[in-house]
From Swiss-Prot:
This is Pantothenate synthetase. Catalyzes the condensation of pantoate with beta-alanine in an ATP-dependent reaction via a pantoyl-adenylate intermediate. Signal peptide: none annotated. PANTHER family: CYTIDYLATE KINASE/PANTOATE-BETA-ALANINE LIGASE, PANTOATE--BETA-ALANINE LIGASE. NCBIfam families: panC. It is found in: Cytoplasm. Its EC number is 6.3.2.1. ATP binds at residues 43-50, 161-164, 190, 198-201. The reaction proceeds by a bi uni uni bi ping pong mechanism. Belongs to the pantothenate synthetase family. It catalyses: (R)-pantoate + beta-alanine + ATP = (R)-pantothenate + AMP + diphosphate + H(+).
Amino acid sequence: MTRRDTPKFTAGQLNVYTRPGDVAAVTRALRATGRRIVLVPTMGALHEGHLTLIRAAKRVTGAVVVVSIFVNPLQFAANEDLGAYPRTLDADLDALRAEGVDIAFTPTADDMYPNGMRTTVHPGPLGAELEGALRPTHFAGVLTVVLKLFNTVRPDRAYFGEKDFQQLALIRQMVTDLDLEVEIQGVPIVREPDGLAMSSRNRYLDAVQREQAGALSAALLAGMYAAGEGTAAAVDAARAVLDEVPAIEVDYLEVRDAMLGPAPEVGMGRMLVAGRLGATRLLDNIAIDIGVPSGPGRQAEFDEHELPWRN
């Protein structure tokens, strides 16, 4: 058996690998020198939300930052937009160079699934709720590819955005239940000036739809302010905003607890919304304080709430 040498890695520049074995060998060698491996998984079409994840990863002392770019076919159903999903690899690599990323891992589907997509990770009951109720195979595909990325890169830490909050919760669940030695870091949603959560799919919206899409974050904001009166009041306030924009076909609007279990009567919760504008599906969510009376000074507390779209 011929031993393969470790692929070349040059510090101070972007190193691009497509084969899982190559990136595994490089990260293993770097880890042996005491470096920490930090992973930012993406599907490409990078925007400011992704770059915020990368910048958070780069703040880890001694980190080698690995960004994966892979449009995972396993998480798309037959009727979904796999073929239309934006692929901008050259521009993405330029963005990674500008951010000082160390490694880009850009496998093909054949690289990731050389024996076909036959073994998957079952997401459990939470994977059949919210997004999973509408996309029953989605989270099995997500968790499978994330586990494969973890097994290949062996990161000490991995960064995910909170926009896909259910995905983040399920990844944390998988790490706990399967005893994976990786720390998961969630990063707050990055928003456009009008509040729309940044997403690679936003580019599908025409000018009218783009303006209408701002109702999603406005609805969440209304729900957050009403949450002191309880969950039902929060949902009613958010629904009233969405009803003003009938072009948005709402798939769900729900309040859960911070781990996406049933909403508490009092305490921190998470309001989640998903809907369609034309052929484009959009997700958003926000943390809310449920059942806490307004009272003197409470408005000031809300005014200090972290709202990235307040300019």
